[in-house]
Amino acid sequence: LVKRLHDENIYVIGRIAVFQDQRLPLARPDLALYSSSTGQIWKDNKGLMWMDTAAPEVWDYNIAVAKELLARGLDEVNFDYVRFASDGNLNDIKHPFWDEKTLKTHIVRDFFDRIRAEIPDGRVSADLFGLVTINKDGLGIGQHLEYAWPDFDAIAPMVYPSHYFPGFIGFENPADYPYEIVKYSMDVAVKRIVALQASASTTPMTDRFRPWFQDFNLGATYDAVKVKAQIQAYEDALAGHPELDGGWMLWNPSNIYTKDALEEEPIANSQ
């Protein structure tokens, strides 16, 4: 399959759902979050299981999977769900490894550092909550933009307008304002990274943004106009810093995408 995709000039990314995992908890329940009230494996609002973000063996397992994917010829590994759980009865969670004293942002940062240390030459990327672009307190999930940036080839903030809270930058329903939401978020993110790179004393970082955009109906109907608005907002936000532009991606959980929002690129050497 990888060869076929490469033959079609397709860049192949393998995505790993890291700490939200529906198989590893069954094989290694000792590494999973569990319920303090029932003693069973804890599940979020969707009935999904989670691993302890601080468990070293969970880090080892996911990094080993990433190495195998790269060894099999994939161009990049994308790490998703690189965070603490955020939905469900969080007060009922017991962590077998996290001491509940170490900052969540430091736990996740150390995992990111470990990824880069173990995969120094392979291309890796990470998905972050969209609000991480403007927030610096970790959002309760441990994600911090400046902590993630040095360790990945691409950072993918999920700046879905529907996921922003009512009243965000004055919009009662942010989903109705895709350009404004994405532009504001990426403007702030770019400013933060420019400042980070200016203060770096090591070799210049080569990381880039490659955000996820909304192509699904939530909060508003997402047609070609709204999808294009996000793309335009991103291009406008990155216009002054093309070195940070790593492209963009669309997300639809049903894999049904708005073709009219996309433009065909010219085929190389075409007549």
Language-model features, listed with the residues they occupy:
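Aromatic-lined carbohydrate-recognition surfaces of secreted/lumenal glycan-active proteins
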Residues: H6, Y11-D21, N78-A85, D99-G142, ...
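Active-site-adjacent "subsite" loops/lids of carbohydrate-active enzymes
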Residues: V2-K3, F19-A71
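Short, acidic/polar
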Residues: P56-L70, K136-A148, Y222-A239
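The substrate-binding groove and active-site-proximal loops of carbohydrate-active enzymes
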Residues: K46-D60, F97-H106, E172-Y179, D215-T221
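Substrate-binding cleft of secreted/luminal carbohydrate-active enzymes
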Residues: F152-P166, A175-Q271
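Alpha/beta enzyme core
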Residues: A64-F79, R83-S86
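Generic structural signal for well-ordered alpha-helices
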Residues: V2-K3, A66-K67, V108-R116, L145, ...
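Glycine-rich, proline-tolerant flexible connector loops at the mouths of alpha/beta enzymes
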Residues: Y81-T102, F165-P166, G170
